[in-house]
UniProtKB/Swiss-Prot annotation:
Membrane topology (UniProt): Multi-pass membrane protein
Nucleotide-binding among keywords: no
One CC-aspect GO term: plasma membrane
Name of the protein described by the UniProt record: UPF0060 membrane protein SAOUHSC_02615
InterPro entries: UPF0060 (IPR003844)
Pfam families, alphabetized: UPF0060
TM regions (residue ranges): 5-25, 31-51, 60-80, 86-106
Chief location bin: membrane
Length: 108
């Protein structure tokens, strides 16, 4: 179970990091090089996601969505200095429970 978690985290870092660099370029006036690097990192995210050991694309991406939510809230706390409120936390917990329900049962 550690390998899929590692891939989810690595994919999340690429998706959030790449998206943030594009945000900086388009919304905050950073150079186009920053946007280009962000785009390259987002492409890398798409490749990394294919390394998951689960056979179903839809299930992998649905489960990754829960991980992405948690990582986005952590990013907001660390980078944007925006603390999640109780509804953010409750929603994130519900998402993680959903991810576990989707990934933990063995399927024949």
């Amino acid at each position: 179970m550690l390998y899929p978690i590692f891939i989810f985290i690595l994919a999340g870092l690429c998706e959030i990091g790449g998206g943030y660099l594009i945000w900086l370029w388009l919304r905050e006036g950073q150079s186009s090089l920053v946007g280009l690097i962000g785009g390259a990192i987002l492409m890398l995210y798409g490749v990394i996601a294919t390394f998951q050991s689960f056979p179903s694309f839809g299930r992998v991406y649905a489960a990754y969505g829960g991980v992405f939510i948690i990582m986005s809230l952590i990013f907001a706390m660390v980078v944007d200095k925006q603390m999640p409120d109780k509804y953010d936390v409750i929603g994130a917990i519900i998402c993680i429970v959903g991810v576990l329900v989707m990934l933990l049962p063995s399927r024949a």
